[in-house]
Amino acid sequence: MYFKESTGFPKDFLWGSASAAYQVEGAWAEDGKKPSVWDKFVRIPGKTFKATTGDKAVDHYHMYKEDVRLMGEMGLKTYRFSIAWSRIYPDGNGQVNEAGLKFYEDLIDELIKNNIKPIITLYHWDLPQALEDQYHGWEDRRIVDDFVNYATTLFKRYGDRVKHWIILNEQNVFTGHGWMLAKHPPGKFKDMKTYYQVNHHAFMAHAKSVLALKELYPDALVGSSFAYGPAYAVSDKPEDQMACVDYEDLKSYYWMDVYAYGRYPRSAMKYLESLGVAPHFEEGDAEILKEAASKVDFMGVNYYKTCSIE
């Protein structure tokens, strides 16, 4: 076994913290913002603990200057925050909301003033409710163009000051909890075929947004983040080892391979095809996924736990 003495973290390592718009901002219906799917979902009895909502949260929308000052005192070098799509485009598309753009612009400037690098997450699960009402959100291919339009608006507005971008936060979580477990909007249970099609639409939104950013700002750093849980076989028995391989193909590499290589794991796709739940591709999708994968700069990994497979 080889041991090497640690030299510590690099001096330019970005120690920081992160948040999600719905979890911290509050101001859920102020300055032109319209409801997101979470604003509606939390009002369904039994969906949240003691019917709690993010209507006020920690009031970051009004307290951001104080929050940033405290971040500076903590010594944070970076702050990753998400943007509420329905604060920028209240209806998900159509008319842009200048008040929403101004809020995030002021937040970015305040961070920079305090020597904190802003990292923007474009999507942390708060789809505009208007798009859910118009065409069922991520279930419809139209979501791709609406998302890229939203993303491009942000790139053009903030790209001169923001270098680091995350397109989607934990795609595997918001799709799994939304279409398989009914824990998140839209609250569907074991809708497997829709689940895989929703993921394909999300991959296309990710890929086209990556390409849009690189066209505007070639030196920007971009990727998506993924909730990765390493899997370990419970024994060295061949059947347990193969079960672990299959699990990782369907629960991890199904996302990571698309981000990194621009293609789905072959064995996973064969399995989904045998079940009749493989996603539908439009002409050119495979090429777009491949091109975007060649231009991503990183993959964010959110690590919670491991799992044992048999």
Regions found by a protein language model. Name each.
Residues Y2-T48, G72, D91-N93, L101-E310:
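Active-site region of glycoside hydrolase catalytic domains
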Residues F49-M63, E139-R141:
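Active-site mouth loops of central-metabolism enzymes
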Residues H60-D67, P90, G100:
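Internal amphipathic alpha-helical repeat/solenoid segments
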